[in-house]
Regions:
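Conserved acetyl-CoA-binding loop-helix of GNAT-fold acetyltransferases
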Residues: 75, 81-94, 117, 121
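Conserved beta-strand in the GNAT
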Residues: 42, 48-57, 69, 74
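Active-site rim helix/loop that mediates acceptor-substrate recognition in acyltransferases
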Residues: 24-40
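A conserved beta-turn-beta hairpin within the catalytic core of GNAT-like acetyltransferases
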Residues: 58-70, 80, 127-128
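Conserved GNAT acetyl-CoA-binding A-motif
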Residues: 89, 96-108
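A short beta-loop-alpha structural element at the N-terminal edge
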Residues: 2-16
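Conserved acetyl-CoA-binding loop of GNAT-fold acetyltransferases
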Residues: 120-129
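Conserved beta-strand-loop-alpha-helix junction that forms the acyl-donor binding cleft
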Residues: 105-115, 133, 137
Length: 139
């Protein structure tokens, strides 16, 4: 099975939308391809999009440098366990390094043990902190 990781293309829109809905149940993607602060990544196998990852560029105003947040990492169920997620994470790291990013950051629910294993395998370190968020809009 050959997995190719590449930059998202507008032709991937429908496939990514289906994948996001299956993974997160309520999300619907909008077109952000013209926004320079976002970099979308897909994994492809035999012409089918089987993985998606979103990188968001964020400026740290204290250090006057940027970092990247990784969001919406998802892999089609039948392709899990074949290294798709790891390949996308490696691509994201290479991209962020190439663009001068200070670090990569992501959040993950504590119940997603398999995802935690992937992130730790890719060199991410679980930090001793809690995230607080207040929803302003309910979906």
């Amino acid at each position: 099975m050959e997995i190719r990781v590449r930059e998202y293309d507008k032709k991937d829109f429908d496939g990514v939308n289906i994948m996001l809905y299956e993974a997160f149940r309520r999300l619907k993607k909008i077109d952000i391809s013209d926004n320079p602060n976002f970099h979308e990544v897909v994994a492809e196998c035999n012409g089918r999009v089987v993985g998606y990852l979103l990188l968001t560029k964020v400026l740290n105003p204290i250090r006057n440098r940027h970092y990247y947040i990784i969001d919406y990492v998802c892999v089609v169920r039948d392709y899990r366990g074949y290294g798709v997620g790891e390949k996308m994470m490696n691509y994201a790291e290479e991209y962020a390094r190439h663009c001068g990013g200070m670090y990569l950051q992501l959040t993950c629910r504590w119940t997603r043990i398999e995802a935690h294993k992937l992130y730790e395998k890719c060199g991410f370190v679980k930090r001793e902190s809690d995230i607080f968020r207040k929803e302003l809009i309910w979906y």
